[in-house]
Amino acid sequence: MQQWSSKVTNRVWVMGDAVVDLIPEGELHYLRCPGGAPANVAVGVARLGGESAFIGRVGADPFGRFMAGTLASEGVDTRHLIQDPAHRTSTVLVELDAEGERSFTFMVRPSADQFLTPVDLPVFQAGQWLLTCSIALANEPVRSSCLQAMAAIKAAGGRVCFDPNLRPEVWGNPAEMPPVVREAIAQADVVKLSLEELQLLSGLDDLAAGLATISGPALVLVTRGAAGV
């Protein structure tokens, strides 16, 4: 059995949603797949030989057990992944259009990940990283927990990577999304967002003008599809 220590200085903490994606397989069946941007990052770090740990909640249900087991089997530390008996695991129906573009329908709202509390947070150490996204800001209590985690790891001497990954349909009040996400961006050291997300958050179409509205991060990466980063 793998032995974990939360004091490892180069640990990557990943906070947010661990999702079961339902992907069409033919006309009558859906394939159950592990998903969620934060969960994917946690697995990616582990596969590259790094030490990653997941902070979040899934339901105490079959999908939650599937996600917890999948992350653990990939070498992710799941001691801070809580199986919540009161709420269901986030489940997303994924559809592809004729051009291969994906669309997402969130089947459980609010899902278990939205009920993470500050009590669920670990103690961060200097040199560690926290990666999170805006789904962990969509509603309370996870919003306060996420902002507290970002502040705590920076106070401890760690760093924050933030991927907005905007999903307005998850927010109880979508009008809160731009100001809350901008608050998180200001706390981050590294931010990765798409050009469309930058335009939405800044209200500006021009890339350079949009970037000029961002202050705080040391590095901002903007993805532009086929045009690159």
Annotate each predicted stretch with a short phrase.
Residues E51-C133:
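Conserved N-terminal subdomain of the carbohydrate kinase-like
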